[in-house]
Amino acid sequence: MPKSVIIPAGSSAPLAPFVPGTLADGVVYVSGTLAFDQHNNVLFADDPKAQTRHVLETIRKVIETAGGTMADVTFNSIFITDWKNYAAINETYAEFFPGDKPARFCIQCGLVKPDALVEIATIAHIAK
């Protein structure tokens, strides 16, 4: 099965040569996602909960465009700029995964824009 490019309606053009997601063999791979507006400006500077919510809503759009749901998420890679935001990010993250939680990792690192606090890349298995 060839891969399909997943670009939800209203998506902004990425800052680099990539797409929001790809679908191959029933697996959705969602690119690293930040809290950007349509012009790739960071939204909600200094608000880790709002950034996390925006990131996960964007990820949900990619997965739903591919035909899945957030319940299909099997793995998240989480990148944060400061451990002081870890609890706030987890609080919002848990709202999107109320049942069985996906596997994940979380590391502290620098991100592509100074006001970005969290970036998440996701894998979801939607094959039935």
From Swiss-Prot:
Hydrolase as a keyword?
yes
Its quaternary organisation is: Homotrimer.
Keywords, A to Z? Hydrolase
Which GO molecular-function terms appear in the entry?
deaminase activity
- The membrane-spanning stretches of this chain are none
Q: What is this protein called?
A: 3-aminoacrylate deaminase RutC
Listed PROSITE patterns:
UPF0076
The enzyme's first-digit EC class, named in words, is: hydrolase
Q: Which reaction does it catalyse?
A: (Z)-3-aminoacrylate + H2O + H(+) = 3-oxopropanoate + NH4(+)
Gene3D superfamilies assigned: RutC-like
Species:
Escherichia coli O157:H7
EC nos:
3.5.-.-
Protein family according to the UniProt entry: Belongs to the RutC family.
Q: So which domain of life are we looking at?
A: Bacteria
Q: What does this protein do?
A: Involved in pyrimidine catabolism. Catalyzes the deamination of 3-aminoacrylate to malonic semialdehyde, a reaction that can also occur spontaneously. RutC may facilitate the reaction and modulate the metabolic fitness, rather than catalyzing essential functions.
A GO term from the CC aspect: cytosol
- One biological-process term from Gene Ontology? uracil catabolic process
